[in-house]
Each structure stands twice: as structure tokens, then as C-alpha cells.
Amino acid sequence: YTNALDPWKKLKIASEKNGTPEVFALAQILKISAWHKTLESFGPMPYSHAADATMNIPFDSEKEVYTAMFEELTAAIEELTEKAENGVNVMGAYDAVYAGDATKWVKYGNSLMLRLAMRVRFADAELAKKYATQAVNHSIGVMTAKDDAAQMSQGAGMTFRNNIEWLAGNYNEARMGSSIFSYLMGYEDPRLSVYFLPMDGNASYGVEAFDGKTYQAVPAGHANAQNDIYKSCSKPNIQSGTPTYWLRASEVYFLRAEAALVWEGFGSADSWYKQGIDM
């Protein structure tokens, strides 16, 4: 939340000064990308007046924040759609996500709108349906291909290190927990070796799994602190160059499947779900 606030405010001021609303459109999408996670984690939050120069910032309700996010996404998508239709590259030299491809940003914005719509459907079905419909029926639409994914790895002359790998490798704090291990073992889920690395061949501890490899999970209830117990357990199967994903086409297909289950006019839930798996 706080890390996104200052850059967003600077881009807002710069775009107004330079007459570049498309830059502010990108800033809005990035802000919502970060702040919707804060909203879902903590509930009511400062939003509409978050950047005001005052010590007394009011909190907005969850409904107010979601409503504002939908409206801001709509405006940002509209601005970038015009640029996409005219083949305009938006800040390509500084864009580490899509290299200035306005069409990709519109797809991401619409996909983010669909995600938010499906997250509010139990609280406000009418609002959810309105913006889910708007997202999928947009002229450019939502993500449909793997290369539509919003992710950080390399771009704009920069290389990014995966933050989970950094925590696992440098701080020895990100390890496999006993709950996920129990589920994966119980169902003999082949994703076990995709998600986590087996123990070193010289390890004298661990549990042999159905795939013939040995894993060790952090015991349930263990103290959340850096220590040798964490260090000795199975790491996430993530490398330094593994992209950090914000949103992928596979999630969008699953969201469309969910929408199709509850509303008419959203296609086949079965078809969307299978496409999500294939993606």
C-alpha cells in the first residue's frame, strides 16, 4: 500500500503537468493492482483521499473502495483503448511489464476488473455482473493467451529476482508447510514436485512421497521465526529468474467459468474451465 502511494502520486502530478493522461491510466491500473490486495487483507482503508496533504485521512468502506476502483479502471481502460486502437506505444522504454503495448495493458485492466467483479458477487451481485459483463464484452477484452500475463521478470533494461526465491534463499524463511504437504500427499497430487523441491540426497530426515522423492514440511504450530527448522525443510520450486505473476490468462478462464455458472450470457462454464487448465 505505502510503496505504491508515492510513485502513484508522482505519476499523477507529472501526467497532469505534461498532458499525458495515458501515463496516469497506467498509474491507476498499477495502483489498483496493489491496493485491492490491501483491501482484501484489511478491509476499510484510506482510498479516495489517500494522497491528500493532511494528517486526518478518512477511511473508505469496502463498498466505496470497490466502486471507486471499478470507476477508475473504466476510465483508465477507455484512455488506453484509444491509444491501442491508434497503435500508440505508452512509455515503452520504462515499461518492464508490457514494453508499452497498450493492447496488453487494456487486457490486463479488463482482467483485473473481472477479478474484482467476481470477488464482490456475494456482497453485491448486481455490481459484480455489471462490471464482469463490461470486462468480457469490451472491444479488446480480457487475457486469452499465455503472453498476455502481467508479470515481472525482464524488461525496460532490468532483470528482476523472484521475491519468493529471495526469501527462501537468503533468509531461509519460505518453506513448505505441513497443511499443503498433507493435501498433496493425500491426493497423490503430481503438482508436489512442481511446487516444492525434494530434500538433498544426503538428508537424514524427511518423508518419502508417492513420487519416490523425500520432502520435509514445517511442522504445524512451529514458531514463525528464522531458525534451523525452517532452513531444513523443502524449498519452493522457484528459481531466481522465475517470473513474479500479477495475473495470468489461466485465472481469467477460471473467472469466466465462475461467471458462467451464475449468470446467463457468459458462455460455457465447462469450456472456460477446461481452457483454464490447458492454459
Q: Where in this protein do the model-derived segments appear?
A:
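Structured, solvent-exposed acidic/aromatic patches
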Residues: 1-279
